[in-house]
Amino acid sequence: MAAPSLVDLEVLSVWRGLARGGLLEARRADLALADLQAIPIQRVDHTALLGRCWELRHNLTIYDAAYVALAEALQVTMLTGDQRLASAPGPTCPIEVSKANRHRPDVP
């Protein structure tokens, strides 16, 4: 499994919001951080992806474009929980929508 190196910052940003909203206890967040660091994800520097991210800017956020650009570069299927991302024009990699998305009621 591979992801742009920004994956960790995105996860922490979500957890910060949950913690500030009282939906994630500090102890659980600390344990989750250790779990995140232990996940065997190949974290790929996004610098080489910037050109493709910019090309995708009209249809995707730059953050989403980084994941798409990486999947394209690795010639693999991208896994997401975001149906809108999967339906957006521009990506050339296959995109599969996970059915395990519990936080987005708008995703089937």
At which residue positions do the language-model features occur?
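Active-site neighborhoods of divalent-metal-dependent phosphate/nucleic-acid chemistry enzymes
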Residues: 39-81
